[in-house]
């Protein structure tokens, strides 16, 4: 799930119930088959919970709020529900959450101006290396800052119905614009920091949402972000989504991988 920050309406000084969650990749399209060979499905037992990104044969990168002790992954999938000949399944031998991630906010779905979801990043060490094939391929980490205004591609199996939270059958893609962090700072009451990216459409209609957490944000062909959190209903005007900014974490990622071969 993308970390959805539920909007709690204030009424007469009190807090009302949150509105229905509008949960899906909004304004997206079915990804071309095998066009995202680095995209990974992350599970808790047999329940799909998040996306992820294959960095090399042994390592998957995802969001820290996707953490469960029972995580496992599937690679080479297009259809979330069907067993495909291309699919590979791996257990997770160890999880490495970024030490700066505030786990006290883990799965806390309310809004507060002091909440800071920075460092929402986790590495998963696979119990057995993935077989690198035409449909299972790693993607490189960024070496340069992303450019504002870039066209970015996000992908995921996020929910396709607003109330039943039913995940998409086929991997979905959506094109988003990389926006100034100030836009997200104005849009959300939670803290938007320099280790985050802001992406969406000012007019709304395109967004990632519940079920897309941990998946890639690829800007001008380069992996730049990991889907982290955002507003619900998803795809609202002037409510772009927030992504973990990977260029800020390449040293931690590389060091963690090197020390845990």
UniProtKB/Swiss-Prot annotation:
Specify one Pfam family.
Trypsin
| Residues of this chain annotated as glycosylated in UniProt | 102
Enzyme type, top EC level? hydrolase
* Active site residues according to the UniProt entry: 65, 120, 213
| EC number(s) recorded for this UniProt protein | 3.4.21.35
Q: List S-S links within the chain.
A: 31-173, 50-66, 152-219, 184-198, 209-234
Q: Which InterPro entries match?
A: Peptidase_S1_PA, Peptidase_S1_PA_chymotrypsin, Peptidase_S1A, Trypsin_dom, TRYPSIN_HIS, TRYPSIN_SER
Keyword annotations: Disulfide bond, Glycoprotein, Hydrolase, Protease, Serine protease, Signal, Zymogen
Query: Which PANTHER family does this entry report, sorted A to Z?
Result: KALLIKREIN-1, KALLIKREIN-RELATED
Entry function: Glandular kallikreins cleave Met-Lys and Arg-Ser bonds in kininogen to release Lys-bradykinin.
Q: What is this protein called?
A: Kallikrein 1-related peptidase b9
Q: What is the lineage of its organism?
A: Eukaryota, Metazoa, Chordata, Craniata, Vertebrata
């Amino acid at each position: 799930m993308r970390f959805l920050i539920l909007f709690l309406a204030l009424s007469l000084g009190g807090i009302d119930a949150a509105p229905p969650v509008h949960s899906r990749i909004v304004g997206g399209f079915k990804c071309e088959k095998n066009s995202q060979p680095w995209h990974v499905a992350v599970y808790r037992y047999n329940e799909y919970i998040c996306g992820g990104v294959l960095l090399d044969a042994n390592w998957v990168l995802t969001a820290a709020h996707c953490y469960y002790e029972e995580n496992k992954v599937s690679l080479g999938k297009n259809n979330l529900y069907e067993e495909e000949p291309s699919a590979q399944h791996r257990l997770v031998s160890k999880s490495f959450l970024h030490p700066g991630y505030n786990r006290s906010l883990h799965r806390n779905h309310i809004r507060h101006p002091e909440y800071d979801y920075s460092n929402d990043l986790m590495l998963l060490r696979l119990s057995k290396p993935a077989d690198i094939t035409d449909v299972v391929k790693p993607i490189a980490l960024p070496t340069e800052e992303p450019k504002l205004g870039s066209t970015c591609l996000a992908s995921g199996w996020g929910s396709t119905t607003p109330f039943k939270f039913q995940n998409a059958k086929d991997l979905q893609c959506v094109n988003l614009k990389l926006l100034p962090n100030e836009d997200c700072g104005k849009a959300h009451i939670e803290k938007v920091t320099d280790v985050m990216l802001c992406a969406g459409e000012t007019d709304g209609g395109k967004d990632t949402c519940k079920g897309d957490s941990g998946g890639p944000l690829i800007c001008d062909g380069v992996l730049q972000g990991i889907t982290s959190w955002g507003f619900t209903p998803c795809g609202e005007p002037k409510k772009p989504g927030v992504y973990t900014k990977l260029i800020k974490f390449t040293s931690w990622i590389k060091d963690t991988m090197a020390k845990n071969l």
